[in-house]
């Protein structure tokens, strides 16, 4: 979104030429802070820009409600490199159950919810191991929660891993977990690419009825979705 605003201004100044297509992904069309700052400029972009490319039907509808002409909107889905995330051989669930999340460690990824769920699983005597791959501003908060619930023996946070290591860990996993939620400032997902990669590999996914996720995961058929 904001990049399109900048491009439109540069074209108006004669710095660049050509048509302007603007992608709307997630935070740029959901965060109250971003919208409070950019909504007036988005209105100008809707008039002056050539094409708006929201990554979900949900965002397409929101753009229309914000005043963008329908004829300037085309949903442009994100994709996955299938040469890197090819289907793995079918595997039976392991004991303990291997659960994995790959995400930037922010509020909207809902990993605090995942850790709470792990606390309940451990109390119920379920044998599992949970890996959270990624870095981000919520790392300290999540580690503190793990310590508070005494889950250090079942939850591992190895940080950032290169894509080939992520793929190897996905191949070993039994469940991909991403309980996305709406952040306190309204920040929402678009459609998480990490979910697409897990599905491309062939891992059962568990996520939430959040933003564009139901456009990717067909509930009870290609994965399990629960309310935020």
Question: At which residue positions do the language-model features occur?
Answer:
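Short alpha-helical donor nucleotide-sugar binding micro-motif in glycosyltransferases
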Residues: 160-161, 168-173
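Carbohydrate-associated surface elements
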Residues: 58, 79
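Nucleotide-activated donor-binding/catalytic signature segment of Leloir-type glycosyltransferases, i.e.
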Residues: 141-164
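Short donor-sugar binding/catalytic loops of nucleotide-sugar-dependent glycosyltransferases
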Residues: 102-106, 121, 136, 161
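A short, histidine- and acid-enriched strand-loop-helix "catalytic/donor-clamping" loop
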Residues: 2-5, 13, 18-36, 48-51
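Conserved donor-binding/catalytic core segment of Leloir-type glycosyltransferases
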Residues: 53, 91-109, 115-118, 131
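Short hydrophobic beta-strand element within catalytic cores of glycosyltransferases
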Residues: 195, 200, 204-207, 217, ...
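Acidic donor-binding loop of glycosyltransferase active sites
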Residues: 171-187, 203
């Amino acid at each position: 979104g904001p990049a399109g605003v900048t491009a439109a201004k540069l074209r108006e100044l004669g710095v660049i030429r050509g048509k302007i297509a603007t992608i709307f992904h997630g935070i740029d069309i959901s965060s109250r802070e971003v919208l409070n700052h950019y909504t007036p400029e988005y209105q100008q972009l809707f008039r002056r820009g050539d094409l708006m490319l929201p990554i979900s039907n949900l965002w397409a509808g929101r753009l229309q409600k914000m005043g963008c002409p329908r004829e300037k909107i085309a949903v442009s889905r994100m994709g996955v490199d299938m040469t890197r995330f090819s289907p793995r051989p079918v595997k039976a669930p392991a004991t303990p159950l291997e659960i994995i999340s790959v995400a930037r460690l922010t509020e909207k990824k809902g990993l605090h919810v995942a850790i709470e769920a792990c606390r309940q699983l451990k109390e119920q005597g379920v044998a599992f191991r949970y890996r959270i791959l990624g870095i981000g501003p919520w790392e300290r908060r999540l580690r503190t929660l793990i310590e508070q619930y005494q889950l250090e023996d079942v939850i591992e946070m190895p940080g950032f891993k290169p894509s080939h290591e992520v793929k190897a860990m996905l191949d070993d996993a039994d469940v991909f977990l991403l309980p996305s939620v709406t952040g306190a400032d309204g920040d929402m997902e678009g459609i998480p690419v990490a979910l697409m990669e897990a599905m491309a590999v062939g891992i059962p996914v568990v996520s939430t009825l959040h933003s564009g996720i139901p456009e990717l995961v067909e509930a009870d058929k290609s994965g399990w979705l629960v309310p935020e």
